[in-house]
Protein backbone atom coordinates (compact mmCIF):
# COMPACT_ATOMS: atom_id res chain seq x y z
CA UNK A 1 0.00 0.00 0.00
CA UNK A 2 2.22 2.84 -1.18
CA UNK A 3 1.87 6.15 0.64
CA UNK A 4 1.92 8.89 -2.01
CA UNK A 5 1.42 12.55 -1.12
CA UNK A 6 -0.24 11.55 2.14
CA UNK A 7 -2.75 9.23 0.44
CA UNK A 8 -2.96 5.51 1.12
CA UNK A 9 -3.60 3.62 -2.11
CA UNK A 10 -5.24 0.22 -1.68
CA UNK A 11 -4.01 -2.21 -4.34
CA UNK A 12 -4.83 -5.90 -4.72
CA UNK A 13 -1.25 -7.13 -5.23
CA UNK A 14 -1.89 -10.60 -3.79
CA UNK A 15 -5.15 -11.30 -5.63
CA UNK A 16 -3.83 -12.08 -9.08
CA UNK A 17 -0.29 -13.39 -9.73
CA UNK A 18 -0.35 -11.84 -13.21
CA UNK A 19 -1.12 -8.39 -11.85
CA UNK A 20 2.14 -6.58 -12.48
CA UNK A 21 2.29 -2.92 -11.50
CA UNK A 22 4.46 -0.16 -12.89
CA UNK A 23 3.45 3.45 -12.36
CA UNK A 24 5.28 6.77 -11.83
CA UNK A 25 4.85 8.26 -8.37
CA UNK A 26 3.12 11.35 -9.80
CA UNK A 27 0.13 9.33 -10.99
CA UNK A 28 -0.07 6.32 -8.67
CA UNK A 29 -2.72 7.96 -6.47
CA UNK A 30 -4.87 8.97 -9.45
CA UNK A 31 -7.56 6.62 -10.79
CA UNK A 32 -6.09 3.49 -9.25
CA UNK A 33 -8.33 1.11 -11.23
CA UNK A 34 -6.34 1.90 -14.36
CA UNK A 35 -2.96 1.24 -12.75
CA UNK A 36 -3.34 -1.22 -9.88
CA UNK A 37 -3.98 -4.95 -10.34
CA UNK A 38 -7.48 -6.18 -9.55
CA UNK A 39 -8.76 -9.67 -8.94
CA UNK A 40 -11.12 -9.25 -11.90
CA UNK A 41 -8.11 -9.52 -14.21
CA UNK A 42 -7.98 -13.26 -13.49
CA UNK A 43 -11.60 -13.85 -14.50
CA UNK A 44 -12.13 -15.89 -17.65
CA UNK A 45 -14.75 -14.10 -19.77
CA UNK A 46 -16.03 -15.54 -23.07
CA UNK A 47 -14.91 -13.50 -26.06
CA UNK A 48 -11.86 -12.05 -24.31
CA UNK A 49 -8.63 -13.36 -25.82
CA UNK A 50 -4.86 -12.88 -25.69
CA UNK A 51 -4.57 -11.21 -29.11
CA UNK A 52 -7.74 -9.20 -29.79
CA UNK A 53 -6.32 -7.08 -32.63
CA UNK A 54 -4.49 -9.76 -34.65
CA UNK A 55 -0.94 -8.63 -33.92
CA UNK A 56 0.49 -12.15 -33.98
CA UNK A 57 -0.73 -12.82 -37.51
CA UNK A 58 0.81 -9.51 -38.66
CA UNK A 59 4.34 -10.26 -37.45
CA UNK A 60 6.97 -9.87 -40.15
CA UNK A 61 9.87 -10.64 -37.81
CA UNK A 62 12.43 -8.56 -35.92
CA UNK A 63 9.75 -6.54 -34.15
CA UNK A 64 7.96 -5.42 -37.33
CA UNK A 65 4.18 -5.73 -37.68
CA UNK A 66 2.51 -5.00 -41.00
CA UNK A 67 -1.26 -5.03 -41.40
CA UNK A 68 -1.75 -2.39 -44.11
CA UNK A 69 -0.19 -1.44 -47.41
CA UNK A 70 2.25 1.46 -47.13
CA UNK A 71 2.55 1.33 -43.35
CA UNK A 72 4.60 -0.71 -40.90
CA UNK A 73 4.73 -0.76 -37.11
CA UNK A 74 7.92 -1.25 -35.14
CA UNK A 75 7.76 -2.83 -31.69
CA UNK A 76 10.65 -0.74 -30.40
CA UNK A 77 10.59 -2.16 -26.87
CA UNK A 78 8.34 -3.96 -24.44
CA UNK A 79 8.89 -1.35 -21.73
CA UNK A 80 6.31 1.21 -20.60
CA UNK A 81 6.18 3.80 -17.85
CA UNK A 82 2.86 2.36 -16.66
CA UNK A 83 1.12 -0.99 -16.93
CA UNK A 84 -2.31 0.06 -18.21
CA UNK A 85 -4.72 -2.62 -17.01
CA UNK A 86 -6.67 -2.61 -20.30
CA UNK A 87 -3.69 -2.78 -22.68
CA UNK A 88 -4.48 -4.84 -25.79
CA UNK A 89 -0.84 -6.00 -25.88
CA UNK A 90 -0.71 -7.16 -22.25
CA UNK A 91 -0.07 -10.74 -23.47
CA UNK A 92 2.20 -9.87 -26.41
CA UNK A 93 5.46 -11.91 -26.62
CA UNK A 94 7.83 -8.95 -26.29
CA UNK A 95 10.81 -11.20 -25.58
CA UNK A 96 10.49 -12.53 -29.13
CA UNK A 97 9.46 -9.30 -30.87
CA UNK A 98 11.48 -6.24 -29.90
CA UNK A 99 13.41 -4.41 -32.58
CA UNK A 100 15.77 -2.70 -30.13
CA UNK A 101 16.93 -6.08 -28.82
CA UNK A 102 18.79 -6.78 -32.07
CA UNK A 103 20.07 -3.19 -32.44
CA UNK A 104 17.58 -2.47 -35.24
CA UNK A 105 19.47 -4.18 -38.10
CA UNK A 106 16.94 -6.90 -38.91
CA UNK A 107 14.02 -4.48 -38.77
CA UNK A 108 15.84 -1.97 -40.97
CA UNK A 109 16.54 -4.75 -43.45
CA UNK A 110 12.84 -5.57 -43.70
CA UNK A 111 11.86 -1.92 -44.13
CA UNK A 112 14.54 -1.41 -46.78
CA UNK A 113 13.13 -4.31 -48.77
CA UNK A 114 9.65 -2.80 -49.14
CA UNK A 115 9.76 0.61 -50.78
CA UNK A 116 5.96 0.89 -50.64
CA UNK A 117 6.25 1.69 -46.91
CA UNK A 118 5.91 5.45 -46.49
CA UNK A 119 4.83 5.58 -42.85
CA UNK A 120 6.60 3.96 -39.90
CA UNK A 121 4.82 3.69 -36.56
CA UNK A 122 7.05 3.50 -33.49
CA UNK A 123 5.18 1.61 -30.82
CA UNK A 124 5.77 -1.01 -28.18
CA UNK A 125 5.65 -0.91 -25.24
CA UNK A 126 6.42 2.77 -25.44
CA UNK A 127 9.11 4.11 -27.79
CA UNK A 128 9.80 7.04 -25.46
CA UNK A 129 10.89 4.63 -22.74
CA UNK A 130 14.04 4.29 -24.85
CA UNK A 131 16.74 6.89 -24.39
CA UNK A 132 17.08 9.68 -26.92
CA UNK A 133 20.47 8.28 -27.93
CA UNK A 134 18.84 4.93 -28.68
CA UNK A 135 16.16 6.62 -30.77
CA UNK A 136 18.82 8.67 -32.55
CA UNK A 137 20.59 5.42 -33.44
CA UNK A 138 17.37 4.23 -35.04
CA UNK A 139 16.84 7.45 -37.01
CA UNK A 140 20.45 7.36 -38.24
CA UNK A 141 19.90 3.87 -39.62
CA UNK A 142 16.63 4.93 -41.23
CA UNK A 143 18.24 7.77 -43.21
CA UNK A 144 19.05 5.70 -46.33
CA UNK A 145 15.40 4.58 -46.53
CA UNK A 146 14.17 7.60 -48.45
CA UNK A 147 10.78 6.00 -49.17
CA UNK A 148 9.80 6.54 -45.52
CA UNK A 149 8.14 9.96 -45.29
CA UNK A 150 6.40 9.90 -41.91
CA UNK A 151 7.34 8.81 -38.40
CA UNK A 152 4.41 8.22 -36.09
CA UNK A 153 5.03 7.80 -32.37
CA UNK A 154 2.43 6.02 -30.25
CA UNK A 155 3.28 6.99 -26.70
CA UNK A 156 1.88 7.45 -23.21
CA UNK A 157 5.00 8.97 -21.65
CA UNK A 158 4.20 12.66 -22.28
CA UNK A 159 1.05 12.07 -20.21
CA UNK A 160 2.46 10.06 -17.30
CA UNK A 161 6.11 11.17 -17.32
CA UNK A 162 6.15 14.59 -19.03
CA UNK A 163 9.76 15.29 -18.04
CA UNK A 164 10.75 12.75 -20.71
CA UNK A 165 10.02 15.47 -23.29
CA UNK A 166 13.21 17.38 -22.54
CA UNK A 167 15.39 19.68 -24.64
CA UNK A 168 17.59 16.84 -25.90
CA UNK A 169 14.55 14.97 -27.14
CA UNK A 170 12.85 17.92 -28.84
CA UNK A 171 16.15 19.00 -30.44
CA UNK A 172 16.43 15.52 -31.94
CA UNK A 173 12.85 15.68 -33.20
CA UNK A 174 13.48 19.06 -34.82
CA UNK A 175 16.45 17.61 -36.70
CA UNK A 176 14.50 14.78 -38.34
CA UNK A 177 13.61 14.99 -42.05
CA UNK A 178 10.18 13.39 -41.61
CA UNK A 179 6.63 14.48 -41.14
CA UNK A 180 6.20 13.79 -37.43
CA UNK A 181 3.00 12.59 -35.78
CA UNK A 182 2.57 11.88 -32.09
CA UNK A 183 -0.44 9.87 -30.98
CA UNK A 184 -0.54 10.29 -27.21
CA UNK A 185 -2.91 8.48 -24.89
CA UNK A 186 -4.99 10.33 -22.30
CA UNK A 187 -8.34 9.07 -21.06
CA UNK A 188 -9.40 11.74 -18.58
CA UNK A 189 -9.03 15.50 -18.24
CA UNK A 190 -7.37 15.10 -14.83
CA UNK A 191 -4.32 13.63 -16.54
CA UNK A 192 -3.55 16.90 -18.32
CA UNK A 193 -1.96 19.06 -15.64
CA UNK A 194 0.55 21.88 -16.13
CA UNK A 195 3.68 19.76 -16.77
CA UNK A 196 1.80 17.51 -19.18
CA UNK A 197 0.41 20.49 -21.10
CA UNK A 198 3.92 21.96 -21.36
CA UNK A 199 5.28 18.67 -22.71
CA UNK A 200 2.53 18.39 -25.32
CA UNK A 201 3.08 21.95 -26.50
CA UNK A 202 6.82 21.27 -26.74
CA UNK A 203 6.10 18.42 -29.16
CA UNK A 204 4.12 20.82 -31.32
CA UNK A 205 6.92 23.38 -31.30
CA UNK A 206 9.30 20.65 -32.45
CA UNK A 207 7.21 20.29 -35.60
CA UNK A 208 4.97 17.37 -34.70
CA UNK A 209 1.26 16.99 -35.27
CA UNK A 210 -0.07 15.83 -31.90
CA UNK A 211 -3.20 13.68 -31.72
CA UNK A 212 -4.82 11.89 -28.80
CA UNK A 213 -6.35 8.46 -28.55
CA UNK A 214 -8.61 7.45 -25.69
CA UNK A 215 -10.23 4.21 -24.65
CA UNK A 216 -13.79 4.25 -23.35
CA UNK A 217 -13.46 2.73 -19.86
CA UNK A 218 -16.18 1.83 -17.39
CA UNK A 219 -15.89 3.93 -14.26
CA UNK A 220 -13.16 6.15 -15.72
CA UNK A 221 -14.51 8.22 -18.63
CA UNK A 222 -17.86 6.67 -19.52
CA UNK A 223 -19.90 9.86 -19.42
CA UNK A 224 -20.40 12.62 -21.96
CA UNK A 225 -19.23 15.14 -19.35
CA UNK A 226 -15.92 13.31 -18.87
CA UNK A 227 -15.29 13.06 -22.60
CA UNK A 228 -16.20 16.70 -23.26
CA UNK A 229 -13.88 17.86 -20.48
CA UNK A 230 -11.06 15.74 -21.89
CA UNK A 231 -11.52 17.19 -25.38
CA UNK A 232 -11.50 20.76 -24.06
CA UNK A 233 -8.32 20.14 -22.07
CA UNK A 234 -6.64 18.53 -25.07
CA UNK A 235 -7.50 21.46 -27.32
CA UNK A 236 -6.06 23.81 -24.68
CA UNK A 237 -2.81 21.80 -24.84
CA UNK A 238 -2.63 22.01 -28.63
CA UNK A 239 -3.70 18.39 -29.11
CA UNK A 240 -6.43 17.17 -31.47
CA UNK A 241 -8.84 14.65 -29.89
CA UNK A 242 -8.61 12.03 -32.63
CA UNK A 243 -9.56 8.50 -31.59
CA UNK A 244 -12.08 7.22 -29.07
CA UNK A 245 -11.71 3.44 -29.00
CA UNK A 246 -14.08 0.87 -27.64
CA UNK A 247 -12.26 -1.55 -25.37
CA UNK A 248 -10.26 -4.21 -27.20
CA UNK A 249 -11.41 -7.53 -25.78
CA UNK A 250 -8.12 -8.63 -24.26
CA UNK A 251 -8.17 -11.26 -21.55
CA UNK A 252 -8.09 -9.61 -18.13
CA UNK A 253 -9.84 -6.35 -19.04
CA UNK A 254 -13.53 -7.29 -19.25
CA UNK A 255 -14.39 -5.25 -16.15
CA UNK A 256 -13.63 -2.07 -18.13
CA UNK A 257 -16.13 -2.77 -20.92
CA UNK A 258 -18.81 -0.15 -21.55
CA UNK A 259 -21.85 -1.81 -23.18
CA UNK A 260 -22.81 -0.28 -26.53
CA UNK A 261 -26.52 -0.53 -27.32
Annotate the PLM regions.
Residues 57-87:
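N-terminal pre-triad scaffold of radical SAM enzymes
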Residues 74-75, 87, 119-122, 127-128:
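Conserved catalytic-core segments centered on acid/base and nucleophilic motifs
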Residues 14, 27, 72, 80-83, ...:
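Generic hydrophobic, aliphatic-rich segments that mediate packing or membrane embedding
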Residues 94-96, 124-125, 153:
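Surface-exposed cleft-lining segments at the edges of enzyme active sites
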Residues 13, 259-261:
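Short, intrinsically disordered, charge-balanced linker/junction segments flanking boundaries
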Amino acid sequence: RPDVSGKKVELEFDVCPRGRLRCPRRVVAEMKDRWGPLGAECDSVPGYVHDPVGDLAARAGAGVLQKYHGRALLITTGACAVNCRYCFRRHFPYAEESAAANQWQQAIGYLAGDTSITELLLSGGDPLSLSTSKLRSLSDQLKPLTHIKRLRFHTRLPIVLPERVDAEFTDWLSSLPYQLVFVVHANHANELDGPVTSALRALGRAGATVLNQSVLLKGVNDSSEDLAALSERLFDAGVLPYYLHLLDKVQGAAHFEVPVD
